Amino acid sequence: MNHQIVILGKEILSVYHGIKEFGPDMVHFVCTEETNQLPDRILPLLPSSIQHKIYHVQPYDARTVAQVCEQIQKENEGFFAYNLSEGTKLMTLGAIYIVRKYQAKAFYLTPNREIVHLDTLEKELMHTTLENHEIVSLSGNHLAEYHNAKDLAEADIDASASIKNFIEQHPKEHARLQKFFGIFCRRDLINLPASKLFQDGLRYKQRDGSLFIYKENQPLLSLPHTNACHLYFEGRWWETLVANQVRIWSNKQSSPREVWQSVLFQSNKQDTRTKNEVDVLLNNELKLMFIECKSGYVSQNDIYKIDAVRETYGGDISQAVLASYYPIAKDLQDKCADLQIYLFAPKTADQRIDFIYTLPDRLDEWSGALIL
């Protein structure tokens, strides 16, 4: 029987990933009062064939840790491996004492998907990766709904590109329509009239989701697409274009990454309401990258929201990106830097036209930074 002895610490991903990578028959969780709830998050994700036991120790008592590990060795037979990626230094020292005494194996998992074998200090890449749903579950959160970006409809992408061109060619008309939607419709499509004629000759028509915009009877934007109003008025056109570029980048990787769009989370088990928390979610192997897409004005509250979402659903090792269609004020750029939020935004309004196509290059840069 293969046994894996796991020293639990505050971070849970390396613990679960070590189990997934090696597939032991029995897992021995060595935890403290502060970490004794972590196995409850891990166990539902494990195959039913994997057995487990839980042991309690003090975080700074190396002797007790050594005694527990020796008890495990004496009461069981088979192969023993220790995951020493987490826990306090004294817990690790207590475990290492038993590793040496019984000539067991021990390993450490690094943030860049490497296994360090502690007996030889040799490194090798892990063979498994963590999926989005696993990382979210391990953070103690619950997915309600998401759309896989690999299933993005070409019609949505084309319509979003047309909306972008309309905004760049007719900024005043776009501002007028968005102001009407914000003030008179309270940013809810349910309140959007079937048509509206403005005093300057600007007019729109919408039916069953399609959208047509005219100026003095000259067509400015024609979208017979059933999702057009949703894309234009709610700003989802920018989210769609960003998600498409992230998808393009992912498909070029040797191991394509998961890309989700419009991710809904359930706040907790008692509260069944859902909230659209994440525009685009990228699984950069062991880390989640949360991408907030802003097609309009960006406030300081938006930046705080991005930071809070990252902390709630991804933890310390995740990253956040603010992808803005418009340039960002200097004070907001500084705030992003202070909170370690990557910023994807044009420096000037003129750069907006082709700026979206530079996102894959930035993802190359950020992806490398994530594993340092």
Q: Where do the language-model regions lie?
A:
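Intrinsically disordered, low-complexity Ser/Thr/Pro/Gly-rich regulatory segments
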Residues: 136-372
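Short beta->alpha junction loops
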Residues: 7, 53-65, 294-297, 325
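Short, aromatic/basic amphipathic alpha-helical patches
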Residues: 18-20, 38-48, 95, 330-340
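N-terminal beta-strand-loop-alpha-helix module at the start
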Residues: 1-41
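Mixed-charge intrinsically disordered linker/loop segments at interdomain junctions
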Residues: 92-162
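A broadly used, surface-exposed interaction patch
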Residues: 26-85, 91-104
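Structural motif
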Residues: 3, 6-10, 26, 31-34, 79-81, 84-86, 264-265, 287-289, ...
